[in-house]
Design a protein with these regions (language model features):
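Beta-strand initiation motifs
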Residues: 10-15, 60-66, 108-113, 152-158, ...
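Long hydrophobic segments that form regular secondary structure
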Residues: 71-145, 149-154, 163, 178, ...
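Non-catalytic accessory segments flanking enzyme active sites
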Residues: 1, 76-93, 98-103, 111-129, ...
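A flexible loop/linker signature enriched in serine peptidases of the S9 family
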Residues: 1-2, 16-22, 38-52, 61, ...
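Cap/lid segment of the alpha/beta-hydrolase catalytic domain
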Residues: 1, 9-12, 243-246, 251-377, ...
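A conserved hydrophobic secondary-structure block that centers on an alpha-helix together
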Residues: 1-25, 30-31
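Active-site-proximal cap/loop segments of hydrolase catalytic domains
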Residues: 332-530
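Beta-propeller blade signature
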Residues: 4-8, 50-59, 101-106, 147-151, ...
């Protein structure tokens, strides 16, 4: 990739170009220049890659950029941020067993690197810095808290905002006066505002089933610009005044359709919990038209992600609206491996415990059937990336449970996954095939290896992208070929390869986005109603 620069005030493109950039942010040093991270190897996925931090002064060519930090000797990796007049750099060795913490006072133009120590007993996850105070969350706490220490005296830690049990601290933002904490609890998202001493100021809460994103903070007026959205409601933009608590619509790109076309008020959204086979309460969001009959005959789409501690939330989907309007049911299961119920929820669905994720997903399907939302002959499953793996495991372990499966850009060969592109960075999530115990655990669920002769698997559409450098399409090619090349397979197995597209597809226009939605939901609806 390349980094290019635009003079916003004059609306001019600058001549500066930074090339051979991947997996890097760019952090400004006022308007003088930017810090960026570069890979020593032009093969970005090479195992012997090392990383360097460079400083680019605007107006100079890239060859003159100053080398600030180099990991060539110890083969570590790092993240960096600029806050006020300091650059923070956090270094982790290849085995992720050792961390070092550095900072640079940007007022010193020599950019001298200094090291600081994180107080004992704290699993440090950086949030923000103000003057000489560093704000962080202690990752030992499952739900997330806010703490601080002075960089010149790191032995004393101040607890500012304690964790709230069962309320996940999803994100934080900081203004000159306030700490803004975004929480999530069983389908409800809200913001708590605090002073820097931890004093609670006020709360803003989104309606049930709605998510939101803070787009902009105005330090001068203490206003938040927030976008609200859900599966069935498009983007509603509000301005929230922290000081007064006033809320106002400032821009709304949602043009409400005619009620006869999409009567949004007759959709019901609820977040329930169901019991997993080992007794865990697993959250699941379910959406359908009000007054639906629970007779086991409703076409239903079940999805999940369940990996890397990711916190999944609703996003507006016009294709889903059509599916619901026609009488469909949609469900999203927050299975273990994700981060929806805290850090332990992630740990209990990774590595040697990864099978918990897949069991949770299968248990979600059985719950929907037992509660008469649907039946196995009316149930479709889908997921992307790690969610594609979840679908691949579910359909190969319980082919009797599903009518349709649509895994997207998934990992299916768990014995060789680390040999492809960034697979080596996922050993911590899935396990290492070179370790005997972990190899056996991977082989126990690897979708490609679990395909059996004599089994008729569900009608399946495997979607991949030819230029996917996160999960290369070879996973999908192999999975599709083995499913297709068996005499017992009577249900159709389709492979869709998106050209000139990467891991997230190629949604370069509204028309292509609509086309992708139409293809997906049409496939699901048609085969659920055969």
């Amino acid at each position: 990739h390349e980094i290019r620069f635009v003079d916003i005030l004059n609306q001019n493109n600058l001549d500066d170009v930074l090339k051979d950039i991947k997996f890097s942010n760019a952090a400004w040093n006022d308007d003088k220049g930017v810090f960026y991270k570069k890979n020593s190897n032009t093969d970005f996925f090479a195992k012997d890659s090392t990383y360097q931090l460079y400083y680019h002064k605007l107006g100079e060519i890239q060859d003159k950029d100053a080398l600030i930090f180099d990991t060539s000797k110890d083969e570590s990796d790092f993240r960096f941020f600029v806050r006020e007049n300091k650059l923070f750099l956090f270094e982790t060795n290849k085995e992720e067993t050792k961390r070092l913490y550095h900072y640079i006072n940007l007022s010193d133009e020599t950019f001298k690197i200094k090291e600081f120590v994180v107080p004992n007993g704290n699993d440090f996850s950086y949030l923000y810095s103000k003057e000489d105070n560093v704000y962080f969350t202690n990752s030992k706490y499952d739900w997330g808290d806010v703490r601080s220490f002075n960089i010149n005296n790191p032995t004393e830690v101040t607890s500012i905002i304690p964790q709230i049990y069962s309320h996940l601290l999803v994100d934080t933002d900081f203004t000159s006066e306030y700490i803004i904490c975004k929480y999530r609890n069983l389908g409800r998202n809200y913001i708590n505002i605090h002073n820097y001493d931890g004093t609670f100021v006020r709360k803003f809460e989104a309606p049930m089933g709605m998510n939101f994103k803070i787009r902009f903070l105005d330090n001068k007026t203490n206003e938040l610009y927030v976008t609200f959205y859900s599966y069935t409601i498009s983007y509603l933009n509000y301005k929230l005044n922290i000081t007064t608590g006033d809320t106002n619509v400032y821009y709304n790109d949602f043009i409400e359709p005619k009620p006869t076309l999409f009567p949004f008020n007759h959709f019901e959204t609820k977040t329930i919990t169901y019991k997993s086979r080992d007794g865990k309460d697993v959250p699941m969001t379910i959406i359908h038209k009000k007054g639906i009959q629970l007779n086991g005959k409703n076409p239903t789409l079940l999805e999940a992600y369940g990996g890397f501690g990711s916190v999944s939330g609703p996003s507006y989907d016009v294709g889903l609206l059509h599916f619901l309007e026609k009488g469909g049911v949609y469900a999203f299961a927050e299975i273990r491996g994700g981060g929806e119920k805290g850090r332990k929820w992630h740990k209990d669905g990774r590595g040697l415990k990864k099978m918990n994720s897949f069991n949770d997903f299968i248990d979600a399907a059985e719950f929907l059937i037992s509660e008469k939302y649907t039946s196995s002959n009316k149930l479709a499953i889908s997921g992307a990336s790690n969610g594609g793996l979840v679908v691949g495991v579910a359909m190969t372990q319980r082919p009797d449970l599903f009518k349709v499966a649509v895994p997207k850009v998934g990992v299916y060969d768990m014995i060789k996954f680390e040999q492809y592109t960034i697979g080596k960075f996922h050993l911590d999530e899935y396990g290492n095939p070179e370790n005997e115990e972990e190899f056996n655990a991977l082989l126990n669920y690897s979708p490609y290896h679990k395909i059996k002769e004599g089994v008729n698997y569900p009608t399946t559409l495997i979607i991949t992208s030819e230029n996917d450098d996160r999960v290369p399409p070879v996973h999908s090619y192999k999975f599709a070929a083995r499913l297709q090349n068996r005499a017992a397979q009577k249900n159709p197995i389709y492979l869709q390869v998106k050209s000139n597209a990467g891991h997230y597809g190629k949604i370069s226009s509204y028309e292509k986005s609509v086309q992708a939605d139409a293809e997906f939901y049409s496939f699901v609806w048609e085969h659920l109603n055969e």
